[in-house]
């Protein structure tokens, strides 16, 4: 094995450590939030409270890991490519969100037609079957914490570095693999592989949007809005007879 190959392997491992390190940091942050807020009378045994702490903690962990990595590598915050969105950027946000929704719908139909297990449900949707109001809470949480937090780490740091190392195509694909696998703890059941494959497909689009627009705000908004639309749709499905 050549020195260059070893260097490439080390770079890949480094990004894997950053990705899963961010996930671990998020879990730790969630626990610490509980430790701090519990004595203040916050009902930690309430599912809604636990969900909020988990979402906020993960976002804190992702952003903290991203900043720590940038400092470790002496990289400027500008390397995240975080810019004020232009009208064109907002157009990409709308288009990107519609594409994600279309892909999710198409893949859902395809899975129903094929002799495979149905996709596993995200744990939030499982909780919502008994407490659908939680989905209303997740709409702003997706926009404020889930989309921005995950995109800062996975696109702003991991994809940016992998694209720098290996080029756009490889960088986007490898980042999408890490992104999808990092969501494994949120799923369970026979169809978990299908769910991860769908997440991978959606992540490819988000990653492409980041490189196309060169602005982290675009994938953060697309990610957050897409999730928010899903939560709103499932809420309507659970609480009305419209679907």
Show which residues each predicted segment covers.
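Short, hydrophobic secondary-structure boundary micro-motifs
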Residues: 78-81, 121-124, 190
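N-terminal, membrane-interfacial amphipathic/helix-forming hydrophobic leader that caps
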Residues: 1-98, 105-113, 228-243
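Structural motif marking the loop-to-transmembrane transition
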Residues: 5-13, 17, 44, 48-52, ...
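Transmembrane helix-loop-helix hairpins at the membrane interface
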Residues: 102, 130-243
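Membrane-interface interhelical connector segments
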Residues: 112-132
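Extracytoplasmic/periplasmic mature domains of Sec-exported, cell-envelope-associated bacterial proteins
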Residues: 84-91, 118-123, 185, 198, ...
């Amino acid at each position: 094995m050549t020195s260059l190959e070893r260097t490439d392997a080390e770079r890949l491992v480094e990004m894997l450590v950053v990705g899963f390190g961010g996930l671990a940091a998020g879990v730790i942050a969630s626990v610490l939030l509980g430790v701090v807020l519990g004595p203040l009378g916050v009902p930690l045994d309430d599912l809604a409270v636990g969900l909020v702490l988990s979402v906020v903690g993960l976002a804190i962990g992702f952003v903290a890991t991203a900043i720590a990595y940038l400092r470790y590598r002496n990289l400027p915050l500008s390397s995240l490519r975080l810019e004020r969105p232009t009208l064109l950027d907002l157009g990409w946000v709308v288009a990107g969100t519609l594409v994600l929704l279309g892909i999710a719908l198409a893949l859902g139909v395809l899975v129903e037609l094929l002799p495979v297990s149905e996709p596993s449900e995200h744990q939030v949707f499982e909780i919502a079957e008994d407490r659908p109001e939680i989905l209303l809470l997740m709409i702003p949480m997706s926009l404020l914490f889930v989309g921005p937090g995950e995109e800062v780490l996975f696109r702003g740091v991991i994809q940016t570095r992998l694209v720098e190392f290996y080029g756009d195509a490889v960088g986007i694909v490898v980042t999408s693999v890490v992104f999808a696998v990092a969501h494994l703890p949120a799923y369970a059941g026979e169809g978990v592989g299908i769910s991860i494959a769908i997440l991978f497909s959606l992540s490819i689009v988000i990653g492409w949007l980041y490189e196309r627009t060169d602005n982290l705000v675009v994938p953060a908004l697309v990610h957050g809005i897409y999730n928010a639309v899903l939560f709103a749709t499932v809420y309507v499905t659970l609480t009305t007879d419209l679907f």
